[in-house]
């Protein structure tokens, strides 16, 4: 395990060149198979998707019984199907996303106002922090019709600490996960810290949910809000769903942590790539100007008319998938794949990062070239296996429709209204390191100065 280094996805990619796209390795006592090609990924996630629909459960995920309630970790069964159905048909349906669009537009205006203020003061912006606040507010507006955080506030830092606390504990390697004999001793304190962070976040979410339930009881004739919380309260009352309040609070935790951490990380990578490539930045700005005209905040309906912006987001996802190994899967029974037996209980990791950097799939794989997606009809929605940052099959990320809108609209708002320069020009080295965790982010935060365009 120690030989994998701090960037296991890169180490696995190098090993796959020697041992092939389907290779096995022992991580402690945990037998693991690494998948590094689109063909093998399709076998695992599509052809044998039911066999590999299980999850290996990290010790941290046992906090507050999250593993027994979370849609992300529940086995495929009645409860999982009910939550999946709510996400697909109601929470993230096209109509639901359209209904909540104006709520998100208000939060984009707040980002614009904050960036304008920084521009007038001549101060740089920590893009990760600004993206985190905006993403969290976009999600809060969509989920709860409320604002969770504000720019430059103490409450924001506290909320950020909780979210990043949960994400870091879930994402950081824990020896007790690979040597089960250590679990009762919790040598790294992972379970103890996870209980604290999970408990704090679940407490906040339960408060929002219970407040809405009580409001609905006290005001049965009040008009419903265009947010996901109304959908969840309706689901609790519906006889065709067998869900309890805790199912919905843990679902919201998954959406908050998964959505905010991955979207924040990806926005930072997108802005880094554009600032480092002035000619690409100029192309995006020109396209946005031609479509948006005098509008300051992009409307989500404009997205189909912004192919180069879409290509930029895809190219960033190819180079920097936020979860490079996706969430681990587990074989629920013995299965032969490509002539190799994968025994029941095997952990399976899909190396999305390796596929995005494979020279047999991509020309100049390490270069930021959005133009490649103008000529190829490839998308990241789970059917093109060379580009699967959100996963694929029955375990594909349920929040992808919202994340897709967030990535495009935040990027458009920042790029259309401002020119950008590095706060410290000497900090233009893209290889200063990354931090591996729930999402792989830059080790050195991107700080850039907005200049009124």
Swiss-Prot record:
It holds the Pfam family p450. Expressed in leaf glandular trichomes. Heme binds at residue 397. This is Ferruginol synthase. Its EC number is 1.14.14.175, 1.14.14.-, 1.14.14.60. It catalyses: abieta-8,11,13-triene + reduced [NADPH--hemoprotein reductase] + O2 = ferruginol + oxidized [NADPH--hemoprotein reductase] + H2O + H(+); ferruginol + reduced [NADPH--hemoprotein reductase] + O2 = 11-hydroxyferruginol + oxidized [NADPH--hemoprotein reductase] + H2O + H(+); miltiradiene + 2 reduced [NADPH--hemoprotein reductase] + 2 O2 = 11-oxomiltiradiene + 2 oxidized [NADPH--hemoprotein reductase] + 3 H2O + 2 H(+). It is an enzyme of class 1 (oxidoreductase). One of its GO terms (biological process) is diterpenoid biosynthetic process. InterPro entries: Cyt_P450, Cyt_P450_CS, Cyt_P450_E_grp-I, Cyt_P450_sf. PROSITE patterns: CYTOCHROME_P450 (PS00086). Monooxygenase involved in the biosynthesis of labdane-related diterpenes natural products. Catalyzes the oxidation of abietatriene to produce ferruginol. Ferruginol is an intermediate in the biosynthesis of carnosate, a potent antioxidant. May also convert miltiradiene into 11-oxomiltiradiene. Keywords: Heme, Iron, Membrane, Metal-binding, Monooxygenase, Oxidoreductase, Transmembrane, Transmembrane helix. GO terms for molecular function: heme binding; iron ion binding; oxidoreductase activity, acting on paired donors, with incorporation or reduction of molecular oxygen, reduced flavin or flavoprotein as one donor, and incorporation of one atom of oxygen. It comes from Salvia pomifera. Its main location: membrane. One of its GO terms (cellular component) is membrane. Signal peptide: none annotated. It is found in: Membrane.
